């Protein structure tokens, strides 16, 4: 086989469909848009959620809830991620940011118990789940709320 003999595999390349190029092509005159109407016009089409003039679902259903502007959002760290640190390391928020585990502290850091921990670490965070605290202490480590 030579370079000039290379061809793309069958069915991997599809030719662009050129519309509005004569009635013989099968896609001439109206270019596959049918006759008149909103969808035949340039830029024509209905907005998202439009139901043909019927009151749309998002307006039929009542409003519910609100966004609390004073909410606290915690950066979440799971136990299995903490295994990358050496035994006896003091894991602080600064160390977590430095090592790229979290991007920023947000309203604080919460340690959750996804995965398991084999290292003996001193973990400093704003919050711990009960299971995470138990697992860290079972591995011989300490938890400190800051």
UniProtKB/Swiss-Prot annotation:
The UniProt entry's GO CC annotations, sorted and at most eight, read: cytosolic large ribosomal subunit
Against InterPro entries, the record matches this protein to: Ribosomal_uL15, Ribosomal_uL15/eL18, Ribosomal_uL15/eL18_sf, Ribosomal_uL15_bac-type, Ribosomal_uL15_CS
Which region ranges are annotated with the description Disordered?
A: 1-50
- Disulfide links within the chain: none
Checking HAMAP family in the record gives: Ribosomal_uL15
- Which UniProt keywords are present, listed alphabetically? Ribonucleoprotein, Ribosomal protein, RNA-binding, rRNA-binding
What's an example GO BP annotation here? Answer: translation
Superkingdom, taxonomy of origin: Bacteria
Query: What is annotated about its quaternary structure and interactions?
Result: Part of the 50S ribosomal subunit.
Keyword Ribosomal protein on this protein?
Answer: yes
PROSITE patterns in the cross-refs:
RIBOSOMAL_L15 (PS00475)
Q: Which sequence ranges are marked TM in the entry?
A: none
What family, per the record?
Answer: Belongs to the universal ribosomal protein uL15 family.
Native source organism of the sequence: Listeria welshimeri serovar 6b (strain ATCC 35897 / DSM 20650 / CCUG 15529 / CIP 8149 / NCTC 11857 / SLCC 5334 / V8)
UniProt GO molecular function: rRNA binding; structural constituent of ribosome
- State where composition is biased (Gly residues): 21-31
Q: What is this protein called?
A: Large ribosomal subunit protein uL15
Pfam families noted in UniProt: Ribosomal_L27A
Please describe what this protein does. Answer: Binds to the 23S rRNA.
Stretches of Basic and acidic residues bias are at 1-18
């Amino acid at each position: 086989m030579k370079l000039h003999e290379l061809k793309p595999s069958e069915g991997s390349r599809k030719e662009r469909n050129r519309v509005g190029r004569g009635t013989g092509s099968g896609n001439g005159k109206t270019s596959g848009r049918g006759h008149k109407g909103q969808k035949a016009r340039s830029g024509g089409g209905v907005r998202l959620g439009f139901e043909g003039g019927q009151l749309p679902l998002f307006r039929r259903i009542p409003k519910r809830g609100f966004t609390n502007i004073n909410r606290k959002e915690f950066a979440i760290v799971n136990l299995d991620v903490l295994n990358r640190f050496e035994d006896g390391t003091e894991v602080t928020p600064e160390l977590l940011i430095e090592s790229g585990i979290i991007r920023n502290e947000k309203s604080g850091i919460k340690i959750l118990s996804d995965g398991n921990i084999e290292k003996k670490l001193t973990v400093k965070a704003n919050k711990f789940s009960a299971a995470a605290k138990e697992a860290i202490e079972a591995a011989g480590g300490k938890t400190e709320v800051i």
